[in-house]
């Protein structure tokens, strides 16, 4: 009887230890996933949407449907005669053509 009781206590102790280890692993995985999501959200907030100014951050444009938007710049002459560069995030013409072809392909085959 003592042997069965000792074996039972040992079994319960091992079971509680292993379940505690598994819970710690799950908690760590949840924390890692949460940190990853927070980092992605921060990176997304730093991105510049389409048609917004990107003069100070030319590589920070968002992604479009298929391609990343490109920072397109033009030179503007102000009323005082100064030339300044103004940039905006947009879709280049060759990307627009590719998106149009893909859109037609989806309508025909999709």
From Swiss-Prot:
Disulphide bond pairs: 54-71, 61-89, 73-87
Propeptide boundaries: 21-44
Source superkingdom: Eukaryota
Location(s), subcellular: Secreted
A molecular function GO annotation: toxin activity
Primary subcellular site in the record, as a coarse category: secreted
Leader sequence residues: 1-20
Keyword Zinc: no
Matching Pfam families: Toxin_35 (PF10530)
Distribution of this protein across tissues and organs: Expressed by the venom gland.
GO cellular component: extracellular region
Keywords: Disulfide bond, Secreted, Signal, Toxin
Family statement: Belongs to the neurotoxin 19 (CSTX) family. 03 subfamily.
Name of this chain's protein: U1-lycotoxin-Ls1gg
Species of provenance: Lycosa singoriensis (Wolf spider)
